Amino acid sequence: GLLNGSTSFAATITATGAVTHNLGTKDVIVQLYDVTTFDTVYADIDRTSVNAVTVTFGSTPTNSIRVLVQKIG
């Protein structure tokens, strides 16, 4: 869902996949964290379109991962 009007988006995922943010730009910062431990999680991020990113993990995460996307500029 939207966090702050049309500038931020958050979603929860459990594996590698696409996240549609509908922010209309590839100028976004993506941050990931484990919803159980609250530790920052690292993954490859591909800005596949102006409205989506793909998150690719090296291995499937143990817990759900919160994806925070923020529009820049």
Predicted regions and their residues:
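Extracellular attachment/recognition segments
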Residues: G1-G73
